[in-house]
Amino acid sequence: MEFIAQFLEMLLAERALSKNSILSYKRDLLDFQHYLAAQKISELNITTGNIRKWIEYLASNNLHARSINRKISTIKSYYAFLISENHTKFNPVLNIDLPKYQNKLPIILSIDQIKLILEYCSKDNTPEGIRLNAMINLLYASGLRVSELVSLKLADILTNNTSKGTVRKIFSVLGKGNKERVIVINDQAVLSIIKYLEIRDFFINKAKSKNLIYLFPSSAVAGYMTRQNFAILLKSVALYTGLNPEHVSPHILRHSFASHLLEGGADLRVIQELLGHADISTTQIYTHLHTNHLKKALLHHPLNKNSFILS
């Protein structure tokens, strides 16, 4: 545990990773150590063969290849750290090939389904409904990560640090790895936020919070609505609108934002910047979605063999 604590401190100090990323590293490392303990293997006397057995163990527990790859990468980084600190001279993961897997195309909502959600939320004039309407409009208009959305501060989106400020249509957020990027939102999102700001005090009073810096304050430990709570609210909207709750989540709204931009003719590099992807290959998944969309559209072409027969 001592080495793990040192490694996590290094990640926090040098790589500026988010709390969620640090927790993910910690879980992977603790799971790995539990495995080693069960096998009576010392982490400082481990072999590449031991690592291969561990990977086989993970696969036998039906862990997805993507998750196995993440765990392997975590352990590889951990041993690189141990070497740099002179705790060991050997990285047993160095020559391990990552399992191959097929990228699944992300689920997206159609534009009509998005409209259905927004229309439903716009009719709920309770404080909770007005807040949810603002959050969904903002998420779909911007493609923010859910962690970025819920932790927005008044100063991020308003011209001054009070709820009386003007809502910016263009503002900046700090994304993964503390990388700043520009966010642009539409008029509908702006109007929904303005309406929400009129009743925001309801949530401040409800939370009995003295921390007024967050756009969406709550009684949660962090001072703002949790990602989990927002996801639950989205599921309830799906049920009320007749949509599959499994197909309505913050991340699916982000996917839908990107896919709809591409369908509308936006440049892939622009979408990459808006999403905050470090690598364009991550964004290219949406081109496959767009291709599938075009293929389905072509099924309705009059010369398609399934719908039109030449005499």
From Swiss-Prot:
Domain of life: Bacteria
Localisation per UniProt entry: Cytoplasm
Record keyword Cell inner membrane present: no
Keyword Cell cycle assigned: yes
Pfam entry (one): Phage_integrase
Annotated keywords: Cell cycle, Cell division, Chromosome partition, Cytoplasm, DNA integration, DNA recombination, DNA-binding
GO cellular component: cytoplasm
BP terms from Gene Ontology: cell division; chromosome segregation; DNA transposition
Core-binding (CB) domain residues: 1-83
Molecular function terms from GO: DNA binding; tyrosine-based site-specific recombinase activity
Domain Tyr recombinase: 104-299
InterPro entries: CB (IPR044068), DNA_brk_join_enz (IPR011010), Integrase-like_cat_sf (IPR013762), Integrase_catalytic (IPR002104), Integrase_recombinase_N (IPR010998), Integrase_SAM-like_N (IPR004107), Recomb_XerD (IPR011932), Tyrosine_recombinase_XerC/XerD (IPR023009)
Active site feature: 145, 176, 251, 254, 277, 286 (o-(3'-phospho-dna)-tyrosine intermediate)
Function: Site-specific tyrosine recombinase, which acts by catalyzing the cutting and rejoining of the recombining DNA molecules. The XerC-XerD complex is essential to convert dimers of the bacterial chromosome into monomers to permit their segregation at cell division. It also contributes to the segregational stability of plasmids.
Family listed: Belongs to the 'phage' integrase family. XerD subfamily.
HAMAP family documented for this protein: Recomb_XerC_XerD, Recomb_XerD
NCBIfam families attached to this UniProt entry: PRK00283.1, recomb_XerD
Subunit structure of this chain's protein: Forms a cyclic heterotetrameric complex composed of two molecules of XerC and two molecules of XerD.
Listed name of the protein: Tyrosine recombinase XerD
Organism for this UniProt entry: Rickettsia prowazekii (strain Madrid E)
